[in-house]
């Protein structure tokens, strides 16, 4: 079989370059490659992660419909889900798993990458990452108890969660 590739212009790459994004060269200026990750990590503190176009619905799932309802801080006076949900102590899996799913899908990978990229050469960024990591993860362990913390992304780990006591000791060491 004969396969022929042609293009209609010699500057195809220039025409199809996305000028709205950040280039690799831009990331090197003023340590942006580290600072950008810190912004994402900060969004995980009370989970205002922006899925685009100003959508901030994860906060409602991770906070309002979960802990706020369970603790009685917030209550929906209108029957929702047949009148049986977290404010009536009928815990809803989708609401209760939201903080875990969002944190481990979007925030903790950025923490992991930031720690690895800054540990040796950029101790200031590494220190800020560690502080933000505690700010993000203390809420997760307070919600769930044992969490995956010290062995996150360890290919040799069997993903046994750390006890809450071990996590808090790790926070302060």
Identify the meaning behind each predicted range:
Residues 9-172:
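Short acidic-aromatic linear motifs embedded in glycine-rich loops, typified by GG[WY][YF]DAGD(H)
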């Amino acid at each position: 079989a004969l396969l022929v590739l042609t293009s209609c212009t010699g500057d195809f790459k220039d025409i199809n370059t996305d000028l709205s994004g950040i280039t690799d060269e831009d990331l090197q200026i003023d340590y942006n490659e580290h600072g950008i990750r810190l912004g994402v990590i900060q969004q995980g503190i009370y989970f205002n992660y922006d899925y685009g176009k100003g959508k901030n619905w994860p906060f409602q799932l991770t906070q309002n419909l979960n802990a706020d309802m369970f603790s009685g801080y917030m209550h929906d006076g209108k029957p929702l889900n047949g009148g049986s949900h977290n404010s009536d102590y009928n815990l809803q899996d989708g609401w209760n798993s939201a903080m875990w799913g969002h944190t481990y899908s979007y925030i903790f990978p950025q923490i992991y990458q930031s720690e690895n990229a800054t540990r040796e050469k950029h101790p200031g960024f590494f220190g800020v990452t560690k502080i933000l990591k505690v700010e993000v993860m203390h809420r997760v362990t307070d919600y769930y108890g044992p969490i995956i913390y010290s062995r996150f992304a360890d290919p040799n780990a069997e993903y046994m969660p750390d006890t809450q006591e071990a996590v808090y000791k790790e926070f302060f060491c």
